[in-house]
Amino acid sequence: MATSDSEFNPDLLLAHKLPETRSTYNERDVAIYALGVGACGQDAVDSDELKFVYHENGQEHIQVLPTFVSLFSLGSLTHGLDLPGFKYDPSLLLHGQQYIEVYRPLPSKASGSLINKVSLAGLQDKGKAAILEIETRSYEQGSDELLCMNRTTGFLRGAGGFSNSYQPFSYKNYPSTQSLAALLYRLSGDYNPLHSDPNVAKLARFPRPILHGLCTLGFAIKAIIKCICKGDPSTVKTISGRFLATVFPGETLITEMWLQGLRVIYQTKVKERNKAVLSGYVDIRGLSSSL
């Protein structure tokens, strides 16, 4: 079980700054890496693989395997060994997952040092274990252009039990819609009379005009930004929503959300009818919530 020098403090953990690291590489490093992952291992003159090791016009023309950028995150999990208020046995650490985004092909030789900005992306209590996520974003020195991003996930055996619940961190939000919500939302451009004309609503077999599905989605995402993202909309990366049932203006929307790493799973229900009307997920760029 994880132990702490003091009571586990999520706010202190989230505010903790991990040190930047530097990386540099050349054509030799690129070729050795390619050979290490089996390039030309079956056929030394395989043109599909030789290009990662040799080029007739010079080594500066060899190509870089996309997974080469994973080297920039080496040691990122060990940064987690020094999280304030959270200690664990590093011998029980297992590399559980690696996620990589490459924004442009890398040259065979770095023009200078690469700056790796390292941050805590997630920490989950799994009872007998914990899951730690470290994000490494790599830039060319002196440039704001992001080259690649690694998200390294470690499985920490015996490190669980630090939170009050083994479930993903959960939140609820209870905003009420106004009776004129559909009339107001239609001014954003959706003028379907189903949402404003009682006669059209009756023809569609609804007792009264219904709320736009995208309006309900807006309520839900706003709730997630408030509860999970500490009010910062720039942390939202992707949004997915499935419309399950209709909402009538004036009903209260309860949005329940569960933080799982960098993904927020959510469900929105109508309080008055206890009926699920929307479900989906939101991917965020960093851990902005409280634990």
Where are the language model's segments positioned?
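Catalytic-pocket segment enriched in acidic/His residues
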Residues: 194-275, 289-291
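Long, contiguous hydrophobic alpha-helical segments, chiefly transmembrane helices and signal peptides
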Residues: 30, 37, 52, 65-70, ...
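Glycine-centered flexibility sites
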Residues: 36-38, 160, 189, 205, ...
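Preference for short coil/turn "hinge" residues that link or interrupt alpha-helices
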Residues: 18, 86-87, 93, 99, ...
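HotDog/MaoC-like acyl-thioester-processing domains
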Residues: 2-19, 96-179, 243-250, 254-291
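Hydrophobic, proline/glycine-rich low-complexity stretches
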Residues: 1-115, 286-291
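A generic structural micro-feature
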Residues: 92, 128-130, 233
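A conserved, well-ordered hydrophobic junction motif at loop->secondary-structure transitions
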Residues: 44-71, 178-231, 235
